[in-house]
Amino acid sequence: MAGHKSIKRIIHRCAEEIDATRRISKVTSFKEGLETFRAKIDIQIMNRNGYYENETRKNHLLRKHDIMIRYYEKTFGDFLKTYDYDHKNKKLPKSEYADCIWVCWWQGLEQAPELVKVCVDSIKRNAGNHRVIILTDDNYKQYVDIPKWVEEKRNKGIISRTHYSDILRLSLLAQHGGMWIDSTFFCTGIGLQEYFKASLWSIKRPDYFHASIAAGYFANYSFACNQEHRWIFKVILDFLLEYWKENDIMTDYLFLDYLIVLVQKYDSQIAEEFKNIKSNNPECDELYKIMGEKFNENKWNELKKNTCLFKLSWKYQYPKEKDGIPTFYGMLVDNKLN
């Protein structure tokens, strides 16, 4: 049965990508539509080979990003020219949640996998005086206002839970500020508190893999801003809501990254703020790659030397031991990784 569901999902995803290619081709050209499809195949290959990126693959991805930005420019049309980019100078009311760390697990932590629980505990442990608010299906409306039409599209299945999370994230940051980090971040130090001192923050590893147009210059699962810079996320949110107001389908899974780059193209002040984010957490993805390996204290000390946030995934099964020796995963879930 599991295999049958997996095959059905693969067929469904292939159909989605073929339809996306058709829509891109109508706006750009047939040749460019095929180029984006080829780049998506490259991404799937990279997902399975440890994200090895040779020069040919990199060029395919960069070409895709160029095509997709032009595609979205045509999709947004006059909105890009008529949008009021000066609204950032209007003062936003102060929020009582400005110092909060926002973490979302829709079903509630009681239903979360062990890895997620450990990660959230690590965030709380290193949050200092910052409140950690766990958002769920039952409580998120207490903290944020989302347009009714968005809720209706979500209930109809037009906006998926993943893309609804994008709207939630941007809405929280636009309305309150504070920090949003994914529930699968394992935090090892007080560096988390330091990021609140910046006007704008995101994990930043310049010239990282090019599967996303972000290429390490930002990571949309990790954002923070102070009260005075909430307008940055208000602009990005306005763009995102405009897209969903006019469209009922997503052309690219990494749309939010394209959107953030598009906003920077049309708003030089936002581009400057992103440029000013200091590089941080260079080893963010490295713990994930060795979760099933035998724990090695020297390797662990080396990883956390200049990184305090490690992005993990709850979707994979890891052994707790290997040849009688605890793995990195085993140390993590036994709360011995610190």
Model-assigned labels for residue ranges:
Residues D166-H176:
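Small-residue hinge/turn detector
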Residues A2-S165, F186-N338:
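Glycosyltransferase-associated regions of secretory-pathway enzymes
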Residues H176, I181-S183:
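Active-site acidic Asp-centered loop
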